[in-house]
């Protein structure tokens, strides 16, 4: 029940719903086709992108908090529920199993899990690993990539939990793999590869 709850909450297609509501278009047919906050930010607007990012964050936090407070006290099941929320976001049952990259629900789940299981310092370090590179490069892909790569080391150092560390590794591989798969055509072109890696945060000039 806990895992199904995580998946269904994660699968709520916020980027699709917000874009449909605001401009009547399908976000899957816009920009890179990613059903997430960054593509919404770039293709629909700043307010829409921020709204989607916030909703996606809440999906992850809500999934693990519902699991923890209402469904189970078993830490492994709660952590897996957060992981399932990311899977639901990336492969939504409502969008023919298409979706985003999972950053929003992943970080939303961590906002709850790390403090609850005694790792508030790791949450602070993780936040710095996002915001410092983001401030220096304005590159959300690079900043979140650094944070996700560091997550297994932070979790292991703070908890020595093999299970939690394994889930952290799988989370990094899943989100990183989704990024590569979603952008595989663009990554073949050196110019596009540079834009995706260096300028991924910037909104294009709509003219």
UniProtKB/Swiss-Prot annotation:
It is a multi-pass membrane protein. Pathway: Lipid metabolism; phospholipid metabolism. The keyword Manganese does not apply. It is an enzyme of class 2 (transferase). SMART domains: G3P_acyltransf. GO terms for cellular component: plasma membrane. One of its GO terms (biological process) is phospholipid biosynthetic process. It catalyses: an acyl phosphate + sn-glycerol 3-phosphate = a 1-acyl-sn-glycero-3-phosphate + phosphate. It is found in: Cell membrane. GO terms for molecular function: acyl-phosphate glycerol-3-phosphate acyltransferase activity. The chain crosses the membrane at residues 44-64, 77-97, 112-132, 140-160, 161-181. It comes from the Bacteria. Keywords: Cell membrane, Lipid biosynthesis, Lipid metabolism, Membrane, Phospholipid biosynthesis, Phospholipid metabolism, Transferase, Transmembrane, Transmembrane helix. Its EC number is 2.3.1.275. InterPro entries: G3P_acylTferase_PlsY. NCBIfam families: PRK14416.1. Probably interacts with PlsX. HAMAP family: PlsY. Catalyzes the transfer of an acyl group from acyl-phosphate (acyl-PO(4)) to glycerol-3-phosphate (G3P) to form lysophosphatidic acid (LPA). This enzyme utilizes acyl-phosphate as fatty acyl donor, but not acyl-CoA or acyl-ACP. Belongs to the PlsY family. This is Glycerol-3-phosphate acyltransferase 1. It comes from Dehalococcoides mccartyi (strain CBDB1).
